[in-house]
Amino acid sequence: MLILVKYGPENPGERWKLESATPEDQIVLIQNGIFWAIAEPEAIQGKKVAIVKPDLEARGYSAQACKLPLVDYAGLITLLEESHKSMS
C-alpha cells in the first residue's frame, strides 16, 4: 500500500497511519509531512519512506542533507500509478 503523509507530527491521524504501516508499505512524506523526518525521525525508523524533494526544499531544507530517498512530483505520480491501494 502507498501511504501519503501530508501533515506533521501534531496530527494524530498521520501518527496513526505511520504506526499502522507494515514493512511492505511505501510511505511518502509530502507537504508538511516532511517534518516527520526532522522532528520525529523515530516514527519512521525501519519503514520504507521517501520524501517529495520540492516539498522539502520549499520548507527551507537541503536535499543534500536528507538521508531518505527523494522523489520529485513525476516520481510521486509514478508511485501512485503503480500502487494497487493507497491511503491519504
Q: What feature does the model see in each segment?
A:
Residues 1-2, 88:
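Absolute protein N-terminus
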Residues 2-14:
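Short, glycine-rich nucleotide/cofactor-binding loops
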Residues 19-23, 39-46:
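Short, conserved loop/helix-junction motifs that constitute active-site signature segments
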Residues 26-32, 48-55:
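Short internal beta-strands
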Residues 44-47, 67-69:
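Short, hinge-like loop/turn segments at secondary-structure boundaries
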Residues 61-88:
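C-terminal structural segments of small proteins and small subunits
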